[in-house]
């Protein structure tokens, strides 16, 4: 039976969206589908953060979900945080259609993202290749525009 989750993204500004997650079997890839609106045109960092705490907005979500204590990277890199999902790309209308698959995150087990926070960032994630210390932690993706806790879905 497939595992499903959903995340409603909201921020202090116009950025908002909904992301659906589906994993057909434990240990299998997770498919993410949805949309984010209100963005500036271009790429925006897209990560799962460690905590599901949004009591003070997106700032209390903690760092990227990184249970293996690795450096920041891109979604196809061996060296990456579990929560590193790269970028979403907004069109000239500020909408990013999300349709991706990731084999590192999970909806169950030790790498489960259930109860953690999904965040979309102000800037492009440099995938850990920016040449400075911040790049190896955050990808220089900038401020947190919108976030939401990932919850179990029917």
UniProtKB/Swiss-Prot annotation:
Gene: SOD1
Modified sites of kind N6-acetyllysine: 123, 137
Residues with the N6-succinyllysine modification: 4, 10, 123, 137
GO cellular component terms, semicolon-separated: cytosol; mitochondrion; nucleus; peroxisome
Family: Belongs to the Cu-Zn superoxide dismutase family.
Lipidation feature positions (S-palmitoyl cysteine): 7
Pfam families: Sod_Cu (PF00080)
Keywords in alphabetical order: Acetylation, Antioxidant, Copper, Cytoplasm, Disulfide bond, Lipoprotein, Metal-binding, Nucleus, Oxidoreductase, Palmitate, Phosphoprotein, Zinc
Cell compartment(s), UniProt: Cytoplasm; Nucleus
Listed name of the protein: Superoxide dismutase [Cu-Zn]
């Amino acid at each position: 039976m497939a595992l499903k989750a959903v995340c409603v993204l909201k921020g202090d500004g116009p950025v908002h969206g909904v992301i659906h997650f589906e994993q057909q079997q434990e240990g299998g890839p997770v498919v993410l589908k949805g949309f984010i609106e209100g963005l500036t045109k271009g790429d925006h960092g897209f990560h799962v953060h460690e905590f599901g705490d949004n009591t003070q907005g997106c700032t209390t979500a903690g760092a990227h979900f990184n249970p293996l204590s690795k450096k920041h990277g891109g979604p196809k890199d061996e060296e990456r945080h579990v929560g590193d999902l790269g970028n979403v790309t907004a069109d000239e209308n500020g909408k990013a259609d999300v349709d991706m698959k990731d084999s590192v995150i999970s909806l169950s087990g030790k790498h489960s993202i259930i109860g953690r926070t999904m965040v979309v960032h102000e800037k492009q994630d440099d995938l850990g290749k920016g040449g400075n210390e911040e790049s190896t932690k955050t990808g220089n993706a900038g401020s947190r525009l919108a976030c939401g806790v990932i919850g179990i879905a029917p």
